[in-house]
Amino acid sequence: MRQVSTPAAHQRRPGAAGIARCRLGILLVSVLLAALVQTGRAAAMSSRLNDAQTELEEDTLSEEVNDPTAMLTQLRLFEFYTPENFRSQAQTNVALVQPIIPIARLSLLPVEQIIRPTVKLSTTATGPGAHTVTGMSDIQLYDLFQSQWPHLERWNLRWAIGTTFVFPTATDRKNGAGAWQIGPAAALAFAGVPNLWVGLLVQNPISFAYTRSDAIPQNTMLFQPGFSYRLGHGWYVKSTDSVWTINWRHGTPTTIPVSFGVGKISQLEGQMVDTWVSGERMAYEQSTAVTPMWTVRFGLNFIFPEFVLGR
């Protein structure tokens, strides 16, 4: 009797080599997928860490850019526009370049220094009309030495003392005092409250030599109080731009302005940049000269946190 074959009788089971290759392929695909997932997680975590580090650096710098005692290298570019003045119909303007140069402790001078020259191009009113004159103003410079009292750090205080100078570089008599000046300078900073910085800068240049016979002797205190408050993500508000001028000589101008502004620390192609805008209003003035009524200020600061001379 002939035996009838069934389809199952002709089926062949895969050999051991085929099963091994199949398992190896599944294993390789699983490893590849796991590696891709892990790489994606690592990249996301690295991106979050970089973003967090950048944000922390921006928040820290938003305090230091306004601190006259901070060892922070900057190149500041300012524009001050005054549309209204007391005792004049003229609109005035000041373009200002102000590098800040910290110097580390050196063998011959074992203290930290902060040098800040200020160069101005000023458009100044010549009288009660609308006429103005534009030219270089006197160059100002201060050289501060950081305090070496470590116990002050426990109180979140930092201060510096030094000397201020004024050089008679003005190209027009309306833009300068016509006098060589030198005097004391000091700065103080307090950062004991989270996100808040409070400080002041005081200078008092006194004239000792003159470039013209009719120059008026100078003895003026420049008092610059201020505060800044960090808002996060590099944003901050501040009142640090107003300089009170208190003249010790009888009959010379005394002015007390107030200001308020907002700024942002950001990173552009690896370069830390501070941009800000503020408004200033004259709160008190005792003067017979042309004095700003209100002023709009713009600032662009290039920040170099890693660069300190001598390090």
Q: What residues fall within each predicted segment?
A:
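Cleavable N-terminal export/targeting peptides
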Residues: M1-E58, V308-R311
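Transmembrane beta-barrel domains of Gram-negative outer membranes and organellar outer membranes
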Residues: A44-R311
